[in-house]
Regions:
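Short amphipathic alpha-helix used as the core "switch/output" element in two-component signaling
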Residues: 75-86
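Acidic catalytic/metal-coordinating carboxylates
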Residues: 47, 73-76
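The feature encodes the CheY-like receiver
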Residues: 70, 98
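Hydrophobic/aromatic residues positioned on beta-strands within the core alpha/beta folds
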Residues: 92-93
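Acidic, metal-coordinating helix/loop segments flanking the phosphotransfer/catalytic sites
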Residues: 44-62
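Non-catalytic signal-transmission and effector/linker regions of two-component phosphorelay proteins
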Residues: 1-16, 119-136
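Two-component/phosphorelay signaling modules centered on CheY-like receiver
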Residues: 24-43
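As written
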Residues: 74, 105-112
Length: 136
């Protein structure tokens, strides 16, 4: 197995990304943005079921995941993806900018949250290199 690493002030940065969002337009924009920042977008998925299948196929080391998905919400999907793809860095996103409590982030195994409208200006390498969130 080959690990793709990008240097950062953290020891590991996810570089092979799965995008999960029910909006095809957002997935396309996010894929373009991630590619411009040096990430490899492996696959895109529109819901939790597609995301789990994509994880089984491509084993991403990072996942950009919408909180508001049809069917299971993004928090439940994040927990399922973390169990299916141990070690993947999960970054939650949403058009809703409300703060996600650390306890919720820890429970669903996400490492960060970024509002969709802030994605273009976010330091994605730092977001995808964060260690798991502690509720302490």
């Amino acid at each position: 197995m080959v690990f793709h690493l990008v240097r950062s002030h953290y020891s590991y940065v996810a570089s092979r990304i799965l995008i999960v969002d029910d909006s095809a337009r957002f997935r396309a924009l996010a894929a373009e943005l991630l590619a411009m920042r040096g990430f490899e977008v492996l696959e895109e998925a529109a819901d939790g079921e597609q995301a789990l299948a994509a994880v089984a196929r491509s084993r991403p080391d990072g996942i950009l995941l919408d909180v508001n998905l049809p069917g299971q919400d993004g928090f439940a999907v994040a927990a399922s993806l973390a169990a299916a793809c141990a070690g993947a860095r999960i970054v939650l996103t949403s058009a809703d900018t409300h703060h996600v409590p650390a306890e919720v982030m820890k429970t669903c195994a996400a490492i960060a949250f970024v509002a969709k409208q802030d994605l273009a200006v976010a330091d994605l390498k730092t977001l995808f290199s964060r260690p798991p969130i502690s509720a302490d």
